[in-house]
Curated annotation (Swiss-Prot):
Family, as annotated: Belongs to the BORCS5 family.
The keyword Phosphoprotein is assigned to this record: yes
Higher taxonomy: Eukaryota, Metazoa, Chordata, Craniata, Vertebrata
Residues where Phosphoserine is found: S71, S75
Tissues and organs where the protein is expressed, per its UniProt entry: Ubiquitously expressed (at protein level).
Gene for this chain: BORCS5
Subunit-structure text: Component of the BLOC-one-related complex (BORC) which is composed of BLOC1S1, BLOC1S2, BORCS5, BORCS6, BORCS7, BORCS8, KXD1 and SNAPIN. Interacts with ARL8B, KIF5A, KLC1 and PLEKHM2; links the lysosomal BORC complex to the microtubule plus-end-directed kinesin motor.
Keywords: Lipoprotein, Lysosome, Membrane, Myristate, Phosphoprotein
CDD domains: BORCS5-like
A Pfam family matched in the record: LOH1CR12
Lipidation (N-myristoyl glycine): G2
Sequence ranges of Polar residues compositional bias: 1-22
Entry-linked InterPro entries: TBORCS5
Protein name, entry field: BLOC-1-related complex subunit 5
């Protein structure tokens, strides 16, 4: 009974394989099956003169730091891989750290000098600003006084116009008075100018 079942199991996979046909997805097209409708204009193009290809050829190649460790690369087990010396890497890192420390000190020194200079400039600007404010207040007072002078000048001009209109009337009125009651001729000039 057990031998019959094992013989049946062995014969079944062969029967399945013989009846199954390969799927069309697995069937690959051959070059004879491809029909080219039009060749196109790419055939006449010269690849060696293509600027993109020239730029790609000018790119330098780079090798990894540890050779033999590229992805997908298989190396024999007995091949000795190149390794970085830890002491040299440590010395490189310490030297780089020292360089960064020196740069940081130089930047901090320059930064402190700039902060000090900025504070000095702020103090100078504040002093200058207060001085200019005081000067502006003084000039505002001067402007008020000049405005008052202008107002007084306008008032004096109006007074002068009134006097110029009044003096002829006084002369006319004085000429109408009798000889004994007439006044001296009215004049706005000082006595010294009249005597000269």
């Amino acid at each position: 009974m057990g031998s019959e079942q094992s013989s049946e199991a062995e014969s079944r996979p062969n029967d399945l394989n013989s009846s199954v046909t390969p799927s069309p997805a697995k069937h690959r097209a051959k070059m004879d099956d491809i029909v080219v409708v039009a060749q196109g204009s790419q055939a006449s193009r010269n690849v060696s003169n293509d600027p993109d290809v020239i730029k790609l050829q000018e790119i330098p190649t780079f090798q990894p730091l540890l050779k033999g460790l590229l992805s997908g690369q298989t190396s024999p087990t007995n091949a000795k891989l190149e390794k970085l010396d830890s002491q040299q890497v440590l010395q490189l890192c310490l030297r780089y750290q020292d360089h960064l420390h020196q740069c940081a000190e130089a930047v901090a020194f320059d930064q402190n000098a700039l902060v000090k200079r900025i504070k000095e400039m702020d103090l100078s600007v504040e002093t200058l600003f207060s001085f200019m404010q005081e000067r502006q207040k003084r000039y505002a007072k001067y402007a008020e006084q000049i405005q008052k002078v202008n107002e007084m000048s306008a008032i004096l001009r109006r007074i002068q116009m009134g006097i110029d209109q009044t003096v002829p009337l006084l002369d006319r009125l004085n000429s109408m008075l009798p000889e004994g009651e007439r006044l001296e001729p009215f004049s706005m000039k000082p006595d010294r100018e009249l005597r000269l």
